């Protein structure tokens, strides 16, 4: 997003179109897209099979606000591929999914704190905009104006791949930790592979 350019010493540019792994900006430059919409464009931009499926879906209607059979099919596919998943809830964004997961963890455990890892981004959730990357790390302080410090204080942040720091957090705050949230491959902190174990 435009707001991130200041953290990488770059000037924002605007995309006019994209196809495959290439984007064309508003100035007509043809560029390689190394970002891929932060994940959703894993098949590249505008692949014909995806465009065809979208056109078929749009021909049936643009939105309903209530469940459709295709959502049931998708949920069944998820639970078939991942047998440990017992329930699936459809939401509109990753931010909403994260918010729902945190609320569920806090509601189920009765605990308040969430443990996350430096540089991991979990959507635009106020309590998780702490050490989210794309700039200098903050320790227990919000990364964004308008996020109350109290929200950030409910988020514990430890270095990625540091099992000892996780243990220490649980020794100190374990009775109040509702959940750990982790981005398997942090996108805002360089590219760190998770260590085994």
Report each predicted region and the residues it spans.
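Active-site and channel-lining beta-strand-loop segments
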Residues: 12-33
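Glycine-rich loop-to-alpha-helix module at the N-terminal edge of alpha/beta enzyme cores
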Residues: 30-112
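Short beta-strands and strand-loop turn motifs
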Residues: 32-35, 179-185
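Alpha-helix capping and helix-loop boundary segments enriched in small/acidic/polar residues
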Residues: 65-66, 92, 157, 189-193
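PLP-dependent aspartate aminotransferase-fold enzymes
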Residues: 76-178
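Active-site-adjacent loop/helix segments that line or gate small-molecule/cofactor pockets in enzymes
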Residues: 1-17
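Active-site core of PLP-dependent enzymes with the aminotransferase class I/II
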Residues: 165-169, 185-197
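Gly-rich Lys/Arg/Thr-decorated short loops/hinges at beta-loop-alpha junctions or inter-strand turns
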Residues: 55-59, 145-153, 181-186
């Amino acid at each position: 997003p435009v707001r991130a350019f200041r953290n990488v010493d770059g000037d924002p540019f605007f995309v006019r179109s994209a196809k495959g792994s290439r984007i064309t900006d508003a100035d007509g430059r043809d560029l390689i897209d190394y970002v891929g919409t932060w994940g959703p464009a894993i098949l590249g931009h505008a692949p014909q099979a995806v465009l065809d499926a979208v056109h078929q879906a749009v021909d049936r209607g643009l939105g309903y606000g209530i469940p459709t059979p295709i959502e049931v099919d998708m949920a069944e596919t998820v639970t078939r591929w991942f047998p440990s998943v017992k329930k699936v809830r459809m939401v509109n964004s990753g931010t909403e999914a994260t918010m729902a997961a945190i609320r569920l963890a806090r509601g189920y455990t009765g605990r308040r704190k969430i443990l996350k890892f430096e540089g991991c981004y979990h959507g635009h959730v106020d309590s998780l905009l702490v050490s989210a990357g794309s700039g200098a790390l903050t320790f227990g302080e919000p990364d964004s104006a308008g996020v109350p410090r109290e929200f950030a204080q409910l988020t514990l942040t430890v270095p990625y791949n540091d099992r000892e720091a996780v243990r220490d957090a649980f020794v100190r705050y374990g009775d109040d930790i509702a959940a750990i949230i982790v981005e398997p491959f942090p996108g805002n902190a360089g590219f760190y592979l998770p260590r085994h174990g």
